[in-house]
Amino acid sequence: MTEKNSKKPAVNIVQIILTIFLVGAAFAIGSMWTELKLLKSGKGTAVNQPTQEAASPQPEEGPLSDEQWQEVLADPVYSEGDEKAQVTLVEFTDYQCPFCKRHFDQTEDQLQSEYIKTGKVRWVIRDLPLSFHQNAHLAAEAARCAGDQNKYKAMHDQLFETQTAWGESATAKTVFSGYAKTLGLNGAAFDQCLTGGKYKDAVDADLALATKIGANGTPTFYVNGQPLVGAQPLAAFKALIDAALQ
């Protein structure tokens, strides 16, 4: 009896170790499977996913000089919020960039409700259409043409919401003309603006400015001159904005 009883603890320990091993293995396999599904669905974390498209690899950006910051603030394509706000958020964007769309889908409305519409932040948009996005430059021009009829933001939203419909289209100009009519614009005036290339040079000027200050990927943001690169979560913006508001 004594001998049989003395072996039971050893058996129990083996069983416990085996159980722990199996549970741990099952957890690891489950975690890997969940992560794989998230990555396939495009819902992975920012750590595991790229947040920006770049024209070429660039070193980490530093804050803008006062001179650069004033140049970035001058004559933007669009601005919203209190012009006397303590903080200005500048966004360099590309309408065909998937990461710019991610920012539009996930973060823009939160910034609007918490900072821009409350008068804490002025929001400025500048164009940075990357050369490998075939319709990005034309889209930037389309938004500006809509701006002639006070519909810049409406076209801005429309372009991001329908990005996959026109991004690789060979008839993007026709698509944009249709958007103009949907938004209630004067179609003839819009078409004349877009076909005539009224804002081609203005978009090119924004591109040149972006290159000059070292913004070579999209989206790129500056909070009072401090850079924030990529489609970052609201928390990343809050850290810079709240610090600037103090």
Outline where the language-model segments fall:
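C-terminal cap of thioredoxin/glutaredoxin-like
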Residues: M1-A55, E108, S177-Q246
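N-terminal low-complexity, Pro/Thr/Ser-rich intrinsically disordered segments
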Residues: Q49-P76
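Short clusters of hydrophobic/aromatic residues that line enzyme substrate/ligand-binding pockets
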Residues: Y78-E80, W166, L228
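Structural alpha/beta surface segment adjacent to cysteine/selenocysteine redox centers
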Residues: A85, V90-K181, N186, I213, ...
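Short, well-ordered turn and helix-capping elements at secondary-structure junctions
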Residues: P76-V77, D127, L207, G225
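A short beta-strand-turn-helix
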Residues: Q70-V87, Y115
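Extracytoplasmic/periplasmic mature domains of Sec-exported, cell-envelope-associated bacterial proteins
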Residues: S65-W69, Q134, E168, A236-A239
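Glycine-rich, flexible loop/turn motifs
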Residues: A74-P76, T162, F190
